[in-house]
Design a protein with these regions (language model features):
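Low-complexity, serine/threonine/proline/glycine-rich extracellular segments that form mucin-like
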Residues: 42-80
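Short, solvent-exposed loop/turn segments enriched in Ser/Thr/Gly
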Residues: 40-45, 120, 134-136
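Low-complexity, intrinsically disordered segments enriched in Ser/Thr together with acidic residues
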Residues: 107-133
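Extracellular adhesion/glycan-binding regions together with long Ser/Thr-
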Residues: 88-116
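Bacterial N-terminal signal peptides that target proteins for export
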Residues: 2-14
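Extracytoplasmic/periplasmic copper-protein system
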Residues: 39, 142-184
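N-terminal edge beta-strand
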Residues: 27-49
Length: 184
């Protein structure tokens, strides 16, 4: 008689969600693992890179930090080097009791190799704006043979699915009881 809950069948059922997740990550664009975060929070952004450029290995990832995001810090990766570039802010901001006139605008991991058939994560910590809305993080993926610019942002009437090379999107959730753009 066939046992529907045999150990072998249970193991296959247990592994199915993991296999589906890996398959989705491998075929996806560069996206944040957590696609939403509260306004004004410190957010650990994990960018998932699911493939290289047209079959070649990834050699560098550069992320542009959008205006309104403060104090971005990259997490080091074994075998990769880091480059952090700052730029002047359009409007100075207060941060930890200091007036900041510049902030981090790009994070770059380079010098490592991520095979096209593998996936990996590139992690950063940042403070999100106090207001809700969508933020777009353009990513330049440099590979052994070519580059991919994940920089497209949806126009009115478009969705991210309409884009060939979308920037990584993060939805910043407005505080409960506050309308977007309204502050006290």
């Amino acid at each position: 008689m066939h046992d529907p809950l045999s150990p072998r069948r249970l193991a296959r059922l247990w592994l199915l969600p993991a296999a589906l997740t890996m398959s989705a990550a491998a075929s996806a664009h560069i996206v944040f693992e957590q696609k939403q975060a509260p306004a004004g929070s410190y957010y650990k952004g994990t960018l998932m890179v699911g493939h290289g450029c047209n079959g070649s290995a990834t050699r560098a990832i550069t992320v542009t930090i959008p205006e309104g995001v403060q104090g971005a810090h990259p997490q080091p990766k074994a075998g990769w080097q880091l480059e952090v570039k700052r730029a002047s802010l359009a409007k100075p901001v207060q941060s930890h009791g200091k007036l900041m006139t510049d902030d981090v605008r790009t994070l770059r991991w380079f010098g490592g190799t991520l095979a096209d058939a593998h996936f990996d994560e590139f992690v950063m910590l940042m403070k999100l704006p106090e207001q809700g809305g969508k933020l777009y993080f353009p990513v330049l993926q440099e590979c052994e043979n070519g580059t991919t610019e994940w920089t497209q942002v949806p126009a009115d009437g478009q969705t991210m699915r309409d884009l060939k090379s979308p920037a990584a999107e993060l939805e910043v959730l407005a505080p409960a009881g506050h309308m977007q753009g309204h502050s006290h």
